[in-house]
Regions:
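Outer-membrane beta-barrel porins/channels
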Residues: 1-163
Length: 163
């Protein structure tokens, strides 16, 4: 992905996502690339508001009943309570499903160490994870989410921030 500040209070970002889905033999596998674009506004020093759109092209997941990767519209907010605690909230609309509400908290007990927890509705989802950032460039984030329909989903990301 790539992001840039348009002004002191407004930023824009774009991101490409690679998806690989492998299911049992009868279903096979599929791969696709989706795009995301987002805007973030700095309302105050501690409060940010963002909006993003994911997969507007409605890429196909399979030919079965026109299955497609999700297309999402998201409006979110982030509030820094202190330099150690951040509250987050989001309203998400998948074009095929009802609106979801999500909330989360991030706690940093030490520099570059982060613990996270979250909750979502429709369907109910709980998530947790931790992150470690080093040298101001590298980020490793590990987590898991439990959703009432599909069960546990592990998450892993490694990010290199280029300036």
């Amino acid at each position: 992905g790539y992001a840039m500040a348009l002004t002191d209070h407004l930023s824009v970002g774009v991101q490409m996502n690679y998806h690989l889905v492998r299911l049992p033999e009868a279903y096979g596998r599929n791969q696709a690339v989706t795009a995301e674009v987002g805007f973030m506004a700095k309302i105050t020093e501690n409060w940010h508001l963002g909006f993003s759109v994911l997969n507007l092209t409605r890429n196909k997941l399979s030919s079965y009943q026109e299955d497609r990767y999700s297309s999402l519209l998201r409006l979110g907010t982030r509030y820094h309570v202190s330099n150690k605690v951040i509250f987050l909230g989001e309203v998400e609309k998948n074009v095929d499903y009802p609106i979801r509400f999500k909330s989360g908290i991030e706690y940093s007990p030490a520099e570059n160490v982060y613990f996270r927890g979250g909750f979502g509705t429709a369907p109910i989802e709980f998530s947790f994870g931790f992150g470690y950032h080093w040298k101001g460039i590298y980020k490793l984030d590990v987590g898991s989410a439990y959703q009432q329909i599909i069960g546990w989903s592990p998450n892993l990301s490694f990010t290199v921030q280029m300036k």
